[in-house]
């Protein structure tokens, strides 16, 4: 159980975010597992709306020596999104298709975009994002990048990394790369 001082500081941080932070028991229990058999109740769950929210979370975690656990849909079978720190769930608010360039065959998306929804959108332009995962109706682009997801036809279409031109990330010091 986190000390009261840390809970108060989390509430103060939440007021500075466009997104939200939840530290109630029910929310934390919901994020204690993914599709794996592993289970660990996190300190809190943050749902950022913006990159600035993520940067504020990073600074808070560094100051308090807490881990941040990035999460999208939680469909992985290996427990990557389970931990005792702050789960950073981008699946709630960071779900936009930002820009499509049909001529050059690329799209820019936020990490919470669901694979099937992405493919439904680009199919209207004769395009397809190659990795065919068994969880395509719920897996999200951020998790696919983090896991280098692949699928039944990877020998033909390749894995996620084979379809990336670039990735914009926020590093552990809060800088962007």
Regions found by a protein language model. Give the residues of each.
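N-terminal accessory segments
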Residues: 1-35, 60-68
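N-terminal glycine-rich flavin-associated loop
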Residues: 13, 36-68, 86, 90-135, ...
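Conserved PLP cofactor-binding pocket of PLP-dependent enzymes
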Residues: 71
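Beta-rich nucleic-acid/ligand-interaction surfaces
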Residues: 138-142
């Amino acid at each position: 159980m986190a000390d009261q001082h840390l809970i108060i500081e989390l509430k103060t941080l939440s007021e500075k975010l466009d997104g939200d932070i939840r530290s109630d028991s029910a929310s934390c229990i919901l994020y204690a597992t993914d599709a794996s058999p592993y289970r660990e109740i996190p300190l809190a769950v943050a749902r950022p709306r913006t990159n600035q929210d993520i940067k504020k979370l990073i600074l808070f975690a560094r100051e308090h020596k807490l881990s941040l656990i990035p999460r999208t849909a939680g469909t992985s079978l290996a427990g990557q999104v389970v931990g005792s720190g702050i789960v950073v769930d981008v699946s709630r608010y960071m779900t936009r298709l930002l820009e499509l360039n049909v001529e050059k065959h690329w799209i820019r998306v936020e990490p919470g975009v669901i694979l099937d929804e992405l493919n439904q959108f680009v199919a209207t332009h004769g395009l397809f994002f190659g990795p065919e995962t068994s969880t395509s109706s719920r897996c999200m682009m951020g998790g696919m990048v983090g896991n280098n997801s692949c699928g039944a036809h990877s020998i033909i279409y390749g894995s996620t990394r084979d379809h990336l031109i670039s990735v914009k990330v926020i590093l552990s010091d809060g800088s962007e790369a």
